[in-house]
Structure formats: C-alpha cells, structure tokens
Amino acid sequence: MTVVREYDPTRDLVGVEDVERRCEVGPSGKLSLFTDLLGDPICRIRHSPSYLMLVAEMGTEKKEIVGMIRGCIKTVTCGQKLDLNHKSQNDVVKPLYTKLAYVLGLRVSPFHRRQGIGFKLVKMMEEWFRQNGAEYSYIATENDNQASVNLFTGKCGYSEFRTPSILVNPVYAHRVNVSRRVTVIKLEPVDAETLYRIRFSTTEFFPRDIDSVLNNKLSLGTFVAVPRGSCYGSGSGSWPGSAKFLEYPPESWAVLSVWNCKDSFLLEVRGASRLRRVVAKTTRVVDKTLPFLKLPSIPSVFEPFGLHFMYGIGGEGPRAVKMVKSLCAHAHNLAKAGGCGVVAAEVAGEDPLRRGIPHWKVLSCDEDLWCIKRLGDDYSDGVVGDWTKSPPGVSIFVDPREF
C-alpha cells in the first residue's frame, strides 16, 4: 500500500536523497543530468510564496520512500485589459492576474514505476492547489520525456501550452569583453521593481510579487544597458530613476537580472565517454593557459557545477539585441567570478531578443514543453477567458525561483 503525505525533513531526508540518486533527468541510455540539492530537497520551491512537498511511502514495518513531488503557488499575469478609468489620451493597459500553481520535481523510484505512484502524487498535489485557491496548474518537461508527457497530458488532463527555449552557455576560463559602445548600469532593487512593473507587468507569467524576487538574497542584481555617450551612459550620477528613464528612454536599451542557482543546487552530467571528458578538459586547460586567445572551452560539466540564471530579459530599440548581448557578457563575467560552469536563460521561442543571448546548441533545449490545466470549472471566464486556450505572446517572464 502506498501512502502519500507531507515531507518531514527530520525523517525523510535520507530516503528522498536515495530516490533522487536513482532517478535521472533525460532519456535513458544517454547523457543524464543529475541534481545535487545540497541537503535541501525543497530548495527549488522554498523561495515561493506558498509551497509543499509530498512523499510517497510504501511498507508497513520497514517503510520506504518511493517517490516525491514538489509544488508551489503564486499570482502571475495571464492577460491584459484596457484601464477604462485612466483619464489620458493614450490607452493604458493593465495586467490580469490569476493564481497559478507549479508542479516540479516529480520523482518515482525506478523499482516502483508503472504502479500509479506518480499519478497519485500529482492528484494529491492538485488537491492542495485547489484548497489554496489556485485556478491553474502547469508543469515543465522535455519534449522527448514521453513518460512524463503521457502522464500529464493523458492521465492528468493537462494540455500542451507553451514551448520556450532554454539557452545555455558555458563559462569560459577567460573574461568576455563587453562592448565599449555600451554602458552597463546596476539598479537598486526598488528601481528594478519600478522598471519591471511599468514595462513588463503585462508579460505572461510575470510574478505579482516581483519585489520579493528582486530582494531575494539569490538575486545578484538587475542591469540596464544603454548606449555609451547617451545622457544615461555618461558616468556616475546619470541615472534619474526608472520612471523618468522610461519616460525619456534612449534610442535602444535592454535589461537583465541574474539569479544565483549555485547556492541552491549543483548539476552534473553523467554517462559521458572517456574521450568526451578528455576533450573537455583539454579545451579548459588551453583556455586557462592562453586566455588571450579567447578560445571557447567546454565547461567542467562532468563533475558538480553551478549556474547563474538570467531572467527578466527585455529591451527596446533597433540595437536592443546588441544591448542584450552586452548584458549577457556582463552576466558571464559575474558567473566566472562566482565559480559557475554555465549561464542559462529561458525565453519564448519567438522572442526577438533571444538572438542576443549567446548559447551552445548542444547544451540548450530549443523547445522546453510547458503543459497547463484548469483546476476548476466553477471559475468564471471573466475578462481573460480560459487561459489554457489563449495564444502565445511574443515573450514570457520566467520566474527564477522555479528554474
């Protein structure tokens, strides 16, 4: 008999870590991605406003953890509407919010699969979502993870919703040059919040508690790129505040924030041949020995490594893509200083700014799969209607707390 209950760190930690070690993320028989949660199984949800971890337990006398699932709830943007009360010649668009739940970290021990344990964990988590007022639930998985896709879109009633791209770039042994034609400005959290709320609050999945994200200890800063020589790029003291900046923006600009995943979890690629390991090590040795050559090197992903996540990427103007590229170079150098192996970002597949995000195709995922489910039929469609049936926008806001 399988019992599903809330995770208890005082007695479940060893069992949960054992299941994590037995499970792999990625197609079986190929390179697999393992996650070291650094002794904290709820590290990927603990920064969310509301979260829960459940475990599946089997046995009577000798009980064994055979599966687990994590979930969290927050309020996000799901659409937009015109502000009819705004007295101005220009239309003002306001965000429409919904309470959204996120399912992640579903694991079932390889020795106990095909017994309905995963389905039971999902249903119990969804019940907690409903009890806490969530209107929608979504999950992220790989397109080729057929077992996961079948479980959620088949048995659990989810539908395919969005296919963003995960873009991953290695951190080299040398620093990357930031364009001399660009000035990078670090914003205070309150200024970053103002900028994001004014310009990006109508972006799909934008978290209503963006202030909590930006003030979190894992958020390493928000950076704005402007043309050098513009009134905002002339040196210290030239930043007038985000509201004034957006009222009189330069011809082109971009913004990006950085989240330190390294202090929450480490990753490791397993299953690589000896030849791959030797080639990767050789490129790193050459890069470190001759950094002036600026040769790209394969990161040490075959041993535990950390990452920085770039989020809140946006910008405007004809040179916005180049501005994003400069911000990514700055983020790379932050990651190098922080001892990370890679930097990553997740953006909508059609986002024009993705062209400014350097990445290695072999490390990236062109189509991550997000599936969504409406949790209750008793919710009125309201202004936004049924979000699960809405067309994708040009961009999305990926919450770093859930990456």
UniProtKB/Swiss-Prot annotation:
Group of enzyme by EC: transferase
Gene Ontology molecular function: N-acetyltransferase activity
Matches recorded under Gene3D superfamilies: 3.40.630.30
InterPro entries: Acyl_CoA_acyltransferase, GNAT_dom, Plant_NAT
Induction annotation: By ethylene.
Assigned keywords, A-Z: Acyltransferase, Growth regulation, Transferase
Disruption phenotype: Unable to develop apical hook in the dark. Reduced length of dark-grown hypocotyls and reduced leaf initiation rate in light-grown seedlings.
EC number: 2.3.1.-
CDD domains to which the protein is assigned, alphabetical: NAT_SF (cd04301)
Domain N-acetyltransferase: 2-177
Pfam families cross-referenced by the UniProt entry: Acetyltransf_1
UniProt xrefs under PROSITE patterns: GNAT
One example of a Gene Ontology biological process annotation: response to ethylene
Role: Ethylene-responsive N-acetyltransferase required for differential cell elongation in the hypocotyl. Regulates apical hook formation of dark-grown seedlings. May control differential cell growth by regulating auxin activity. May be involved in negative feedback regulation of auxin homeostasis through the control of GH3-like genes. Modulates de novo shoot organogenesis.
Similarity field: Belongs to the acetyltransferase family.
Name of the protein described by the UniProt record: Probable N-acetyltransferase HLS1
Organism in which the protein naturally occurs: Arabidopsis thaliana (Mouse-ear cress)
